[in-house]
């Protein structure tokens, strides 16, 4: 089974996981609409692969008031869009044992980027996706840290936990539609997310974690396999240890609160 979607809107495509996923989709035959803040990075992608395989849309997703117009523009230009990958994310150190050093503007920016903008994008594109006669997909890059936090980036973990809970509920809410809801759970991956520019307190941060090529290969195989929840690398440990059981409890709660009308189970949504 191969990746079935032919036109992918990839938000956060300028570097790291997003850039590598964009290139993998292109190489596998999907057309990619690459979105990000850094126009020059998007243009590099178009120059490398050509306009017949990729297009660039510079956009800052933290400008939330502009998201509806952004969605209208994309839909108007690409009415055959069938997959949206929401991959944008930032990670910053926060230490509340030194409250005088905590910058709430940074805390807010991280939450807007990693969670609130993703909710706004979902709302903006869902009416279009739900009207399509063919299956479409929303793919969210969550994190293994949405399941088990670490101290140094507590707000990042909280933002990803919020996204995870949103996605889990969204999947059930959209169960009767043709919109598939997919969540990726990356471990630490060797990208610029941890480099000296973005997190100077981490030594050799861009060498920390799973090699990017290995991550992309495992991720793509999960996507091509049609799975809805894809823990990768070390994230599998947390997912297998307790997350499946927690989702069973969630499933029971959903069934109970719906008077038995909604019978959803997480089994079969995850690679074994």
Give the predicted meaning of each segment.
Residues 143:
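Residue(s) in the substrate-gating loop at a strand-loop-helix junction
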Residues 14-15:
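Conserved glycine-rich cofactor-binding loop
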Residues 165, 171-234:
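SDR active-site lid
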Residues 122, 159:
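Active-site helix of classical SDR
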Residues 28-44:
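Conserved glycine-rich Rossmann-like NAD(P)H-binding loop of the short-chain dehydrogenase/reductase
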Residues 68, 75, 90-108, 152:
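Conserved mid-core segment of classical short-chain dehydrogenase/reductases
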Residues 49-65:
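Rossmann-fold cofactor-recognition segment
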């Amino acid at each position: 089974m191969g990746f079935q979607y032919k036109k992918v809107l990839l938000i956060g495509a300028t570097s790291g996981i997003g850039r590598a996923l964009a290139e993998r989709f292109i190489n596998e035959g999907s057309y990619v609409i690459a979105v990000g803040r850094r126009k020059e990075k998007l243009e590099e992608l178009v120059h490398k692969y050509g306009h017949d395989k990729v297009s660039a849309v510079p956009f800052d997703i933290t400008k939330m008031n502009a998201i509806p117009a952004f969605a209208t523009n994309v839909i108007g230009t690409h009415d055959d869009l069938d997959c949206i990958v929401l991959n944008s994310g930032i990670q910053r150190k926060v230490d509340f044992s030194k409250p005088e050093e905590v910058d709430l503007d940074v805390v807010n920016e991280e939450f807007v980027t990693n969670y609130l903008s993703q909710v706004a994008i979902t709302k903006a594109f869902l009416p279009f996706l739900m009207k399509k006669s063919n299956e479409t997909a929303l793919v969210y890059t969550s994190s293994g840290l949405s399941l088990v936090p670490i101290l140094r980036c507590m707000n990042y973990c909280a933002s990803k936990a919020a996204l995870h809970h949103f996605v889990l509920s969204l999947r059930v809410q959209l169960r009767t539609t043709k919109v598939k809801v997919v969540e990726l759970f990356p471990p630490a991956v060797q990208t610029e997310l941890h480099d000296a520019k973005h997190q100077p307190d981490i030594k050799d941060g861009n060498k920390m974690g799973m090699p990017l090529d290995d991550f992309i290969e495992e991720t793509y195989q999960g996507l091509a396999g049609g799975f809805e929840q894809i823990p990768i690398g070390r994230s599998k440990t947390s997912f297998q240890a307790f997350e499946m059981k927690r989702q069973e409890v969630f499933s029971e709660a959903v069934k109970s609160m719906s008077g038995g009308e909604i019978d959803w189970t997480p089994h079969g949504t995850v690679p074994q």
